[in-house]
Amino acid sequence: MWFKNLQIYRFTRPFEQDADALEKLLDGMAFTPCGSQDISKFGWVAPLGRGTQALVHEAAGQLLLCARKEEKMLPSSVVKDMLDEKVEALEAEQGRALKKKEKEALKEEILVTLLPRAFTRHSQTFLWINPADGYVAV
């Protein structure tokens, strides 16, 4: 694991959480994958990979954490094309232009239909905390 765009920050107050206390805090915010109608999800995962359960890795007083974000990729052009097709068909069927609220309802219906089939993209952000010197690297 290498940091790609390393940002280092200094704490303004002493960092007083130990690994166990931090683990308890993060446990309620553990990562869960996107459901069928979720657009994105964020949470904490084990920094050492899938073989471990600990959300905080401690070594020589240093702490390592990993945040994971999952997003569903639904190109707006696909939604727009489907919306245009449905609007065109309904306008031809009803013989009138659809109102803005009707178009928005159609768009929501299309999103509900497409979200379960959308591809997902994952990203991970590692945090290294040096409590003794008061640094956090992201």
Where are the model-predicted features located?
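Short, flexible turn/loop "capping" segments at secondary-structure junctions
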Residues: 1-2, 58, 129-131
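Short cationic amphipathic helices and targeting signals
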Residues: 7-9, 64-66, 134-138
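Generic structural motif
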Residues: 14-16, 70-72, 132
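Surface-exposed, low-hydrophobicity interaction/linker segments
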Residues: 20-51, 59-126
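Internal, conserved structured core segments that host functional sites
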Residues: 123-137
